[in-house]
Amino acid sequence: MNKKEFILDSLIDDDEAFTQIVEYFELVAEIEISSEEIKILISEMLEEGYITINYSWKNEYNEYPYSLTEKGRKAWENIQE
């Protein structure tokens, strides 16, 4: 999987905020990536329509979570491991 696909994978079961996506990369994906690079990827994925921001709640770090769009869910279904 590429880094954007790992972001999709982190969101498949539930909405996640930035901090949880960073933790996913550290703990699950075990990929070295900077927080800044994750921010850039998230921004690109928002623009591309793969994810959206869920403004209905914030986490303890005052971050809104991200959700998969239908386009993002379809992209996740087509990930080749």
Language-model segment annotations:
Residues A17-V28:
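Short acidic, hydrophobic short linear motifs in intrinsically disordered regions
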Residues M1-S10, E81:
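Short alpha-helical segments that sit at the start of domains
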Residues L46-S56:
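A short, conserved structural fragment
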Residues I31-E48:
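Short amphipathic alpha-helical interaction segments
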Residues Y64-E81:
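Short, amphipathic alpha-helical interaction segments positioned at domain boundaries
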Residues N59-N62:
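Short acidic/glycine-enriched loop/turn segments that link adjacent beta-strands
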Residues D13-D14:
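Short helix-capping/turn signature of helix-turn-helix
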